[in-house]
Regions:
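P-loop NTPase catalytic nucleotide-binding module
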Residues: 1-19, 109-255
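P-loop NTPase switch module centered on the Walker A-proximal segment
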Residues: 1-108, 114, 163, 205, ...
Length: 255
């Protein structure tokens, strides 16, 4: 029992409405092996059956109005995900949830950045010195400059930001991400996004295979931006993260 408790991790997923947190929750469940098919909130038919949006109002409006918890085993840990309501009308449920989790995953829209409800929920997390991980979503749509988003997070929320990965392109040109931690390039699989897919993995920025998947202009831009990231932004500090003073950020698309 002690071993089970030690390996249990509970995350609240917070965001402004429509930033994509329920869709992201579905993908965690999919890649964690808890479900076989993800149900996108904005999709149609079978694909629209979101596991966390189970109330009639939630299904009709495509939003979460109550916190719902989902669990799955991952490696040697037991993961609890709590999908919280983003709309301010239902924020009391979210506030209660935040008091019972180990850390929070803050989802932001790449085109909109920090929005009002995100800021409110972040401040509740800050009152508890809760560690926060950030996911910048919807990179497959037109989005703001990546450095601009990071600057806004740092200035608006007064927290250091350190990228864990970096997007390759954006909008219709979004191809995948460069993993800064493991020095790998992950090229997105554009097949059926409701089922688990295997991305193309390239070893580092100098692997000649990269030219097969990434156009020269995008590769040059990526190299320039990675150099700026390493020169201008802080490295990950575990102590600062645990105290709620630094957030690692990942870029990508929950779809």
């Amino acid at each position: 029992m002690n071993n089970l408790i030690e390996n249990r991790r509970t995350f609240a997923i917070i965001s402004h409405p429509d930033a994509g947190k329920t869709t992201l929750t579905e993908k965690f469940l999919l890649y964690g092996g808890a479900i076989q098919q993800a149900g996108q909130v904005k999709a149609k038919g079978e694909a629209r059956r979101s596991r966390s949006d189970f109330m009639t109002l939630e299904k009709e409006r495509g939003i979460s109005v109550s916190a719902s918890a989902m669990s799955f085993a991952y490696n040697e840990s037991w993961i609890n995900l709590v999908d919280t309501p983003g709309h301010s009308d239902f924020s009391e449920d979210t506030y209660r949830t935040i008091t019972a989790v180990d850390s929070a995953i803050m989802v932001i829209d790449g085109a909109k950045g920090i929005e009002s409800q995100t800021k409110k929920l972040f401040e509740v997390c800050r009152l508890r010195d809760l560690p926060i991980l950030t996911f910048c979503n919807k990179m497959d749509r037109e989005s703001r400059d990546n450095f601009e988003i990071i600057d806004e997070i740092q200035e608006t929320l007064t927290i250091d930001v350190t990228p864990m990965n970096w997007p390759i392109g954006s909008g219709s040109d979004f191809l995948g991400c460069y993993d800064l931690v493991n020095n790998k390039i992950n090229i997105m699989d554009r097949a059926d996004r409701n089922v688990r897919a295997t991305s193309i993995v390239i070893d580092g920025l100098n692997d000649p295979v990269i030219s097969k998947y990434v156009p020269n202009a995008l590769r040059k831009k990526l190299l320039e931006e990675i150099e700026m990231v390493k020169g201008l932004l802080p490295s990950f500090d575990h102590e600062m993260f645990n105290s709620g003073n630094m957030t690692p950020i990942w870029f990508g698309s929950a779809i």
